[in-house]
């Protein structure tokens, strides 16, 4: 398993041992391989004739077709993401303030 550690612990004030360079290189190569494989799959999907259209076909004709507009996508996609980021930022600021106060 790759050794990927931070130089300083998040919760205690103690410093951790330095991480190994070969472990970090192996982890970086694994991530690059995953991105490469994903890019190859997307490239295959986009350039293969008719594959994308076949995957997107709905086989059940009894189900109603639902199209999501920009407003609905914004309300149910972007707004929850921004609220989650705001909650994460508030927790991070609170932890930072608490750490500086000690």
Swiss-Prot record:
It comes from the Bacteria. GO terms for cellular component: plasma membrane. The chain crosses the membrane at residues 25-45, 75-95. It holds the Pfam family DUF2755. The keyword Nuclease does not apply. Keywords: Cell inner membrane, Cell membrane, Membrane, Transmembrane, Transmembrane helix. Residues 1-24, 96-102 are cytoplasmic. It is a multi-pass membrane protein. Residues 46-74 are periplasmic. It is found in: Cell inner membrane. This is Inner membrane protein YaiY. It comes from Escherichia coli (strain K12).
